[in-house]
Each structure stands twice: as C-alpha cells, then as structure tokens.
Amino acid sequence: MAAGSVVLVVLDDCTRECLAAAADTSISGARVARELDAIIARRGPPARIVSDNGTELTSRAILGWTNRTGIAWHYIAPGKPQQNAFAESFIGRLRDELLNEEVFTSLGQARRLIEHWRQDYNQVRPHSAHGGLPPTKARLLAAGARPGLADGPAEPPLATSPSPCYQPNGLPS
C-alpha cells in the first residue's frame, strides 16, 4: 500500500472471520468506534475486545465508546504481539498475500481489493481451526443454519468489482 495508508482490521477470535478491513489515509479513534458500532449492529456485541496499544485504540473516543457500550477492552502488553497471535498472523497474511503484492493506483482500488480478499478469506479459504471449513460457513453451521444457507455470504459484499490483478481461489471476479 502507499506510504501513509493504514488498514483497520477487526477479527472475531472465535469464528476466525474478518469482520472489517477498512483502508484509509489515517484512522482515528472516532472512526474505530464507528466501525465497531456498524459491526455490532450486524452481529451483536462481543464479550470483550482485545487490541494492541495503537494511538487510535487508546484514544478518548475509544474510552468514551467503551463507557457508552459497556464492552470490556483488553490491551495486550506493549511489545508482546504474541498475546494477540491470531491477529498478528492474519495481518501478516494480508500483507504478504495482497498489500505487498499490489501496486494500488488509488485508495478506492485498495479498498475494493482488500474487501475482495476479505470475502475470499471468510467465505472460500479453508481454516484448520474449523476442520477445513471457511469461517463464514463454520459460523453458520455452528449457529444451526440450514446447509443451503451456509453457501452464501453472511452479509452483502461491499466490493462490487474486484481488480483483475487479484484472483482469489474460488471467488468469481
């Protein structure tokens, strides 16, 4: 990605789904709170949130958000990324498979490709933690969804037309 660009990633540690991957030139605590509110509107509140100590995650906006929502927030110890190993592994995979491989011509293109990669990760890619099922399918089956429902996306995709550069396994472009 271009210098000065960042990606906010929100993961469900239980289902292994990537709930959001928001790219922008900067991300404030208020933006993080808005993203979390949107996720909670779709999925319900988590028991707690675990994050690193980034400035956007330790901001007054996030402190106010946790007070307003009552959701516990746990910060990993500084310099101890292994305390959030799944997230670190996911971010490394996103970086290796997409961010370091593409030359994005615009923020819009970056957003589309990241969303397409996220959909592939959630809906197509097998995960050993779920016996080879993709995270979305595993979540739907665990929730008792009918098998036919597990084949479709859990939420409408945000990206409309992925670039021909990134071709994930199994998702039509």
Question: What residues fall within each predicted segment?
Answer:
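C-terminal domain-tail junction helix/linker
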Residues: 69, 92-173
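RNase H-like DDE/DDD metal-dependent nuclease/strand-transfer catalytic core used by mobile genetic elements
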Residues: 1-120
